[in-house]
Regions:
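Accessory helical-bundle/CTD segments and flexible terminal tails appended to RecA-like ATPase motors
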Residues: 1-161
Length: 161
């Protein structure tokens, strides 16, 4: 991910190194809203209010989790929006992906230059705003793809005579 954003566990927040490593591992497992809320609750209970760099770290982990499911191999923030490069070997089938992004958000574009990528078109975003915007949009794309897969597996209803 190419985002110029402070995302780390300060020593002043989690003082013991062993615990910091444990917390980093737990944060790395965040992949959806439920797991994000769970780790945030745990951190508040154990260490107090969550500093901004830790909040950023958690949100980036959540974004990584959802984009990994979509076959995104690289994410970068550019002046025209968030660019998500797709791994051709792990990306969803292009027709379904196109249908899912069309349903998910009108700002998403599917581009094929050197490598296929999704572009979340929103100009001049801060890194924090890019993460906040990309999480729900990419979650919606994932949900739409899941719905399309489910619909494709369901047998057609028999015609009535």
């Amino acid at each position: 991910m190419e985002l110029n954003i402070d995302a780390y566990l300060p020593e002043t927040y989690v003082r013991e190194e062993r615990l910091r490593v444990e917390v980093y591992k737990r944060i790395a497992m965040v992949e959806d809203e439920e797991s994000r809320l769970s780790i945030e609750e745990e951190l508040i209970d154990r260490f107090g209010d969550i500093p901004e760099p830790v909040e950023n770290l958690i949100r980036i982990a959540q974004l990584r989790g959802v984009t990994r499911k979509l076959g995104v191999s690289h994410l970068s923030l550019r002046p025209d929006g968030v660019h998500l490069r797709l791994d051709e070997q792990h990306m969803p089938e292009p027709d379904r992906l196109f249908e899912a992004i069309t349903k998910a958000d009108g700002r998403l574009r599917f581009a094929v230059a050197k490598k296929p990528e999704l572009i979340l078109c929103e100009r001049n975003l801060s890194p924090e705003a890019a993460v906040e915007l990309a999480i729900p949009v990419m979650t919606k794309v994932h949900d739409e793809l899941s719905a399309l897969k489910t619909a494709a597996k369901e047998p057609a209803a028999p015609e009535k005579a």
